[in-house]
Structures are given as C-alpha cells and as structure tokens.
A protein has these predicted regions:
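Membrane interfacial helix motifs at helix-loop boundaries and amphipathic/re-entrant anchors
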Residues: 1-3, 33-36, 53-56, 69-85
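Alpha-helical transmembrane segments
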Residues: 1-18, 87-92
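Alpha-helical transmembrane segments of multipass membrane proteins
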Residues: 11-15, 60, 64-67, 91-95, ...
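Membrane-water interface of transmembrane alpha-helices
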Residues: 16-34, 100-109
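Short membrane-interface loop/juxtamembrane segments of multi-pass integral membrane proteins
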Residues: 37-53
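Select subsegments of transmembrane alpha-helices in polytopic membrane proteins
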Residues: 50-63
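Alpha-helical transmembrane segments and their immediate juxtamembrane interface regions
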Residues: 81-118
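Cysteine-cluster motifs in flexible loop/terminal segments that predominantly coordinate metals
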Residues: 112-131
C-alpha cells in the first residue's frame, strides 16, 4: 500500500520539474514538453507553447505530490487507493489542459519564413526550408 501512494509522488515530482523547466524557458526540444505540430514549427513556438503550459503542469505535479502524501496518511487501504486515483486523474487532467493551452499559444506564433536560396544550385536549399 505504501508503494501505491508513492506513485503519484514520484510522477508529481517529475511533472513539476518538467513544468518548471518549460515555464522558465529552459526545456530543450529533445522529447519532453508540449509536442504538437504547432509547437514543433520553430524554436520560438516551442518556447512559447511550453512557457504557457508550464504553470498548469507545475500545478498538476503539486496535485500529484499532495495526493500521494494524502494517500500515505490515510488509515485504510481503500483511502490510500482513492487518494492515489483522484490525484492521478487530477494530474492527468491538468497536464492535458496545459498541453491544450500551450498548443493554442504556439498557434499564435508566426510560422517561420522559409530560408532563401543563395543561387548556388547546390540542391541543399530544400533541406534548409522548414515547411
């Protein structure tokens, strides 16, 4: 039962850390954060999207940690399981809401202008353009 209550605590700490990195604009584009077509258009869109999603994500992590602590102090096994499940559902809902907000913020960022060709006929310009 002790291990069940630790699940939202550990997940909450990880989610809080990710939200904090996004909010402080320190999250790198290597697999974490809001990863939608809109946020992956440019580095600026990724930065803005994850900054907007940062605060709801931090709150989601705190909800997970609080739910885990509540589960640890519950006198019954059923109370521990209920506290854990409520915390996990709340954490998931807040992370999803933060992702939607981040996606919408990234949509507001202008799409990058395709890189121009210097006329060298090297054939590499298509690799420089991001559609």
């Amino acid at each position: 039962v002790f291990a069940v209550a630790l699940v939202p605590v550990v997940l909450g700490l990880v989610v809080t850390w990710g939200g904090l990195l996004g909010w402080r604009e320190k999250l790198s584009d290597r697999g974490a954060g809001v990863r939608t077509e809109a946020t992956l258009r440019s580095a600026e869109a990724f930065r803005i999207g994850n900054k907007v999603a940062g605060l709801p994500t931090i709150v989601a992590g705190v909800v997970g940690v609080v739910a885990g602590i509540a589960g640890l102090v519950m006198p019954t096994t059923a109370g521990t399981i209920v506290a854990t499940l409520v915390g996990l559902v709340g954490m998931f809902a807040l992370v999803a809401a933060g992702g939607v907000l981040g996606h919408r913020a990234a949509l507001a960022v202008r799409a990058p202008v395709p890189a121009g060709c210097s006329g060298c006929a090297c054939g590499g310009c298509s690799a420089l353009q991001k559609a």
